[in-house]
A protein has these predicted regions:
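Intrinsic-disorder/low-complexity, polar/charged segments enriched in Ser/Thr/Lys/Arg/Asp/Glu/Gln
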Residues: 3, 19-23, 46, 77
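Generic short N-terminal amphipathic or hydrophobic helices
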Residues: 3-5, 83, 103
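Acidic, low-complexity, intrinsically disordered interaction modules
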Residues: 33-98
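Short, extreme N-terminal segment that most often corresponds to the first beta-strand
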Residues: 1-18
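Short intrinsically disordered terminal tails
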Residues: 1-3, 31-32, 105-107
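Edge beta-strand at a domain terminus
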Residues: 21-28, 90-107
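Compositionally biased regions
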Residues: 12, 20-24, 29, 49, ...
């Protein structure tokens, strides 16, 4: 159906101001709508995408990260910012959440 060549960059910032940035280029042949694109085992599960729509100039992906649908156009990077909520573990220790910044570029 189409050849997809996209770059994902994720930056995570914790409450202490420490950051971690990871990038990965996905180069894949998509044969049908509904196909799963696994970015990389190193990326969290929420960055596994399902192809919902595909044309020569636009792709619609669904994923577990907010927002649920990503509309990506060639030459127009997509940016999202969200917070992964903190939690309290079984010992009562509160772990703070992280801010994440996601950029997707269709190369």
């Amino acid at each position: 159906m189409a050849h997809i060549h996209i770059k994902l960059t994720v930056s995570e910032w914790d409450i202490g101001g420490k950051s971690n940035t990871t990038s990965y280029v996905l180069d894949s042949e998509v044969t049908q709508v509904g196909e799963e694109l696994v970015v990389n085992k190193a990326f969290p599960k929420r960055y596994t995408f399902i192809v919902k729509e595909l044309s020569d100039t636009e792709i619609c992906l669904s994923c577990e990260c907010p927002p649920q649908y990503v509309h990506l156009k060639k030459g127009e990077p997509y940016h999202a910012e969200y917070n992964i909520e903190g939690y309290e573990d079984h010992d009562g220790c509160v772990w703070n959440g992280e801010d994440e910044y996601l950029t997707i570029e269709w190369l």
